[in-house]
Amino acid sequence: ELLIGQYFKEECGADFVFVTHYPSKKRPFYAMDDPEDETFTLSFDLLYKGLEITTGGQRIHDYNKLMEKINKRGMETEGMEHYLSAFKHGMPPHGGLGIGLERLTMQLIGEENVREATLFPRDLSRLEP
């Protein structure tokens, strides 16, 4: 990610870079495969100064396609019955993303460690404020 960020800063003067179409095997089972090439997904990461700050993409909304992908990966459906039930009864097309506010803040203020941009950081040696 850092090298991608450096490249686009030098070549295009851009701090923000979208990386799209990740390999299907590297994304969660619910990520929608690209209909033009099912080895890739309709997903993205947004990098800011070489750090991933957002991940997102289109999700599978078809029950049969979702089950096909689950089976292809050899996953068990035990414990996912309620989740899968929603798809059986009809799920509209949808997508989503998640933004790492602490990561974005870290980059904006020029910190080296995300703990410095987090109000109450947690790690292996700190579980309480």
Task: Locate the predicted segments by residue.
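A translation/RNA-centric and nucleic-acid-associated enzymatic feature enriched
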Residues: E1-P129
